[in-house]
Curated annotation (Swiss-Prot):
Entry's localization field: Host cytoplasm; Host nucleus
Motif LXCXE motif: where in chain: 23-27
Protein's recorded name: Protein E7
GO molecular function: DNA binding; DNA-binding transcription factor activity; protein domain specific binding; zinc ion binding
Record has Transcription as a keyword: yes
Motif (Nuclear export signal): 76-84
Function recorded in the entry: Plays a role in viral genome replication by driving entry of quiescent cells into the cell cycle. Stimulation of progression from G1 to S phase allows the virus to efficiently use the cellular DNA replicating machinery to achieve viral genome replication. E7 protein has both transforming and trans-activating activities. Induces the disassembly of the E2F1 transcription factor from RB1, with subsequent transcriptional activation of E2F1-regulated S-phase genes. Interferes with host histone deacetylation mediated by HDAC1 and HDAC2, leading to transcription activation.
GO annotation (BP), single: DNA-templated transcription
Species, as recorded: Human papillomavirus type 6a
């Protein structure tokens, strides 16, 4: 630009089209979906095991007996039903006596 005021002849535009860029990807993808096992699906097929603490009374001396088990929520419900039914827990002191 020359002078104080802008004129159209002072503006130079380079109006050449840009170089074309190939946007195609020519890679071949191998279908390996049959070979792979999805880790998330593998974890869903096995229920999550957790630690559960069971505090109950000895059937012989009524002292507190504490157990820690590792199982699923479904299994701990079954243990609960057994404890409410016929299953009795015996402490180490009373175990030799029975």
């Amino acid at each position: 630009m020359h002078g104080r005021h802008v004129t159209l002849k002072d503006i130079v535009l380079d109006l050449q089209p840009p170089d074309p860029v190939g946007l195609h990807c020519y890679e071949q993808l191998v279908d390996s979906s049959e070979d792979e096992v999805d880790e998330v699906d593998g974890q869903d097929s096995q229920p999550l095991k957790q630690h559960f603490q069971i505090v109950t009374c000895c059937c012989g001396c009524d002292s507190n007996v504490r157990l820690v088990v590792q199982c699923t929520e479904t299994d701990i419900r079954e243990v609960q039903q057994l404890l409410l039914g016929t299953l009795d827990i015996v402490c180490p002191i009373c175990a030799p006596k029975t």
